[in-house]
Amino acid sequence: MKGLYFQQSSTNEEVTFVFQEKENVPVTEDNFVRVQVKACALSHINTKLLAEMKMEKDFFPVGREVSGIVLEVGRKVTFFQPDDEVVGILPLDSEDPGLCEVIRVHEHYLVHKPEKVSWTEAAGVIRDGVRACTALYYLSQLSPGKSVLIMDGASAFGTIAIQLAHHRGAKVISTAHSLEDKQHLERLRPSIARVIDVSNGKVHVAESCLEETGGLGVDIVIDAGVRLYSKDDEPAVKLHLPHKHDIITLLGVGGHWVTTEENLQLDPPDSHCLFLKGATVAFLNDEVWNLSNAQQGKYLCILKDVMEKLSAGVFRPLLDEPIPLYEAKVSMEVVQKNQERKKQVVQF
C-alpha cells in the first residue's frame, strides 16, 4: 500500500514529494479508528510551522483533509462503528498520510459525513469551512447587517467565507485579482455588494470600501496577506495586496481585522489609529484547533456545523475535477507553490 510523503532539503525551502510503501497496520490503540480513504483534499504544507513545532521528520506524511469509511475501531471508541461514513482533518503529527488507501486516526479528529454529501465535497470543504467559521464566528463575531470585506474572494477559501457571511445576513464586499475572478464573484448568489477589481493596480481598496459604506468603514476585514512596506520594497507576488495602512483606514469603529499575515508589524501610529477606532486585530491560524486539545469539543462542533452547512447547500465549494492518486505528486507540487485557484481533491 503506497502513501505520499514529502522530504525537505536541509539547505533551502525546496520540498520533494515521494510515494513510499506503507504497512497496513491494524488498530491497536484504544481510541483510534481505521478508515478506508475515499477522498483527500490537497492543501499547502506550512513547513515553517512544522519546524517551529519541532515536528520535522525525514519523510513527512502528505494530505490531511480526508473522507472515508470506518473499517475497524479501537476498544474505547464511542463515536463510531464499522461502516460509518466520516470526514475530518488529520492532526499535524499524524503518522499516516491522508493520501493513502487506509489510515489510522484518533476518533476525536473525525465527524460523521451526511449521506447526501459526496466524498470529494466533504474532503474539499472541511478545511476552508473551519477557517471561515474561525474567522467569522470566533475572531470577529459576525452578525446580521454587518459589512464584511473578504480579500481575494474568488479563491477556494474566499468563496466559502463569502457564502458563510451571506448566510448570516452580512453585506459582503470582495476584491478580484483578475477578470476571471471578477466574473466568478459577480455570478455568486446572493450577489456581492461590490466587487473591487485590483488587477490593474489603479483602484484604491480603502476608497471603494468607504464609498460603499457611506464613509463609515467596514465592520470586518479578512485579508489574504498584506503589504508592510512600499511597493518598491516588496516582491512582485505581493504587489496586488493592500498596504496595512489601507486596511486600517477602511476599518469602521469597533471593527475587526482578521489577518493571515503572520509577520504583521504595526508601528505606534498604526496602533494609535486602531486604538481611536476601538478596533481589534486577530490572527487567523486554523491549525490552533489541532495544536491544542483545550477546546476539542468546540472544534468538533465546528466540523459538524461545516458538514451541516454543506449538506444544506449553504456551502458550495470551488472544486477542481477530482484526480486519481497517481497524479497527486504532480498536483501537490503545484499546490505547494500556491499556483492553484480551485480546491484539488484526490478521489480513491
From Swiss-Prot:
SUPFAM superfamilies: GroES-like, NAD(P)-binding Rossmann-fold domains. Keywords: Endosome, NADP, Oxidoreductase. Disulfide bonds: none annotated. GO terms for cellular component: early endosome. One of its GO terms (molecular function) is oxidoreductase activity. It is found in: Early endosome. Its EC number is 1.-.-.-. Transmembrane segments: none annotated. Component of the FERRY complex (Five-subunit Endosomal Rab5 and RNA/ribosome intermediary). The FERRY complex directly interacts with mRNAs and RAB5A, and functions as a RAB5A effector involved in the localization and the distribution of specific mRNAs most likely by mediating their endosomal transport. The complex recruits mRNAs and ribosomes to early endosomes through direct mRNA-interaction. Component of the FERRY complex composed of five subunits, TBCK, PPP1R21, FERRY3, CRYZL1 and GATD1 with a ratio of 1:2:1:2:4, respectively. Belongs to the zinc-containing alcohol dehydrogenase family. Quinone oxidoreductase subfamily. This is Quinone oxidoreductase-like protein 1. It comes from Mus musculus (Mouse).
